[in-house]
Design a protein with these regions (language model features):
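Structural recognition of the beta-strand scaffold that forms the well-ordered cores
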Residues: 47-50, 101-102, 108-112, 129-131, ...
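Hydrolase catalytic cores
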Residues: 254-257, 276-284, 346, 412-483
């Protein structure tokens, strides 16, 4: 008996002395090493708890249904999966007085706790992944020149203004001349916020009726004071009830997509579209949860209290000029991937910057969401249609497959647009390229309702009609004449060519599945 007691005591001591980390392999719950690091030595941290039960998005994505129904049906499926799986876990967390925030776009929760809580969650059969939710510094562009003051009031359509070079390059004014400005399309920006009353943006804000502003269902702030930000403060504050841009970057990229102009020159691709926005960064610092929360808001916008979601008010197209560092910061790959797949299944087009890591050479598209097959990834060219040295290249190899990226390229070098405090400036980076494609989709979907919310068909149309560009860099083994290739993708965005192919019904030859 004494020997048995000694064995039991020894086993207990071994269990206490041993790190919790190895338990994850036995329990089949994948716990990221960063989570153990963040909660070591009695520390607490935010982390993502992703449940094993997820909605069957793949089936919904290919199921035949009207465009108007797609967003509603995908939303309902996601909500039902979360409502069925989360109650027992939420009850346990509440009983333990643990702070958490639940999501449905991915069946997951953001939880704040210590290592003992992580160890407990790793024993639950309903949990599949536990991943970090660290704040990280986003690689955002800064102004190339001193900002200038707005010169005069702008017009709602901007068609009377002189277009900036980048708009002429992608042939946006050619569609304006045909009466196509993006009317009827909801354009969404997830970024550092937006100065909603900027003269180049106010009239296009969906929350502005010309007299008063209503930010319900048009704005959401995913930067919460209750979550861990490593001591970061914010010039705008937290949990904002009205749009604010704490950096300027969000105002700039929104201007490229839907801005009017400075009274002399036009800046936006689709100035007739209406925009909504969500802040997913705190002064340039993002978190996986803030990125996911904004995508959820765009799928089913809510009131300012975060309740009464309404998928009928969802975005049509989302412009994403950010990356979530997977290697350097441990950004959660599983949760972000599931979120962008859900967005696509809902018929929402997602234009994403390829990243500014071109200095690393080939296969420098290394961060989500730009590396995902389910998003449309955009590289940066200059006014001579030459790839920018900083623009990240493909192929994507980080997940063990050889995915051709980017999909195509668009202007991103010295692009003039709106900036904070009613000013304008130029910036350079792939952040400037992605809104060109998002704006292009707004124009095409406004012109062709049969194309709206058909993400795959739209991607194919953009790729087929892009201006072919070649590279001798040889990324992914590409020949110097290869099109597509891993530097330019299918080539330079050409909105007029896309429009002409659609309106001349050439899609019946090249894209038979497009005919409605």
């Amino acid at each position: 008996m004494k020997a048995l007691r000694l064995i039991i005591i020894s086993l207990i001591l071994i269990a206490v002395a041993s790190p919790v980390f190895p338990a994850s392999a036995v329990l089949k719950v994948q716990v990221s090493p960063e989570v153990w690091q963040d909660t070591a030595n009695g520390a607490t941290a935010d982390f993502l708890v992703i449940l094993r039960s997820q909605a069957d998005i793949n089936t919904l994505a290919v199921a035949p249904m009207a465009a108007a129904q797609r967003g509603e049906r995908v939303y309902q499926a996601l909500r039902q999966a979360a409502n069925a799986a989360q109650p027992t876990l939420q009850a346990e967390l509440q009983a333990r007085q643990v702070l958490f925030r639940s999501y449905w776009i991915v069946n997951m929760l953001v939880v704040h706790g210590d290592q003992a809580l992580v160890a407990y969650l790793a024993t639950r059969p309903d949990v599949e992944y536990i991943e970090p939710d660290r704040p990280f510094k986003a690689n955002l562009e800064t102004p190339d020149t001193t900002t200038i003051k707005v010169q005069s009031p702008t017009t709602p359509t901007a068609v009377s203004l002189t277009p900036q070079w980048n708009l002429n390059t992608v042939h946006a004014p050619d569609l304006w001349a045909r009466g196509v400005t993006g009317k009827g399309i909801v354009y969404a920006t997830a970024d550092t916020g937006v100065q909603w009353n900027h003269p180049a943006l106010q009239n296009q804000y969906r929350g502005w009726d010309g007299t008063t502003a209503d930010h319900n269902y048009n704005w959401w702030d995913a930067v919460h004071a209750s979550e861990t930000w490593g001591g970061l403060t914010n010039i705008c504050g937290f949990d904002l009830q009205a749009p604010c841009d704490d950096y300027g970057h969000g105002t700039h990229v929104t201007g490229i997509g839907v801005g009017t102009g400075d009274g002399v020159t036009a800046i936006g691709v689709a100035p007739g579209a209406r925009w909504i926005a969500c802040r997913n960064m705190n002064g340039g610092f993002g978190k996986p949860s803030t990125y996911i929360e904004c995508l959820q808001f765009f799928m089913a916008p809510t009131n300012l209290q975060g309740s009464a979601p309404d998928p009928s008010k969802r975005a049509d197209v989302i412009s994403n000029s950010y990356s979530c560092p997977q290697i350097s910061e441990g950004c959660a790959p599983h949760s972000l991937r599931a979120a962008v797949q859900a967005v696509r299944a809902a018929g929402i087009f997602m234009s994403v910057s390829s990243g500014n890591e071109g200095g690393l050479g080939c296969s420098s598209i290394i961060d989500p969401p730009g590396l995902e097959a389910s998003v449309f990834t955009v590289g940066n060219t200059d006014s001579s249609n030459v790839i920018a040295p900083s623009s990240s290249r493909g192929p994507v190899t980080i997940d063990g497959y050889n995915l051709l990226k980017p999909n195509l390229v668009a202007p991103g070098t010295i692009v003039y647009s709106s900036w904070s405090n009613n000013t304008f400036t130029t910036l350079t980076g792939t952040s400037m390229s992605a809104p060109h494609v998002a704006g292009a989709v707004a124009l095409l979907w406004s012109a062709f309702h049969w194309l709206k919310n058909d993400v795959f068909a739209t991607e194919l149309l953009l790729e087929i009609t892009a201006k072919p560009l070649t590279s001798s860099q040889g990324c992914g083994g590409d020949s110097p004449t290869a099109v597509p290739n891993n530097v330019y993708g299918y080539g330079l965005l050409d909105i007029l060519a896309s429009y002409n192919m659609a309106i001349s019904k050439l899609e019946k030859i090249y894209l038979p599945f497009l005919t409605k």
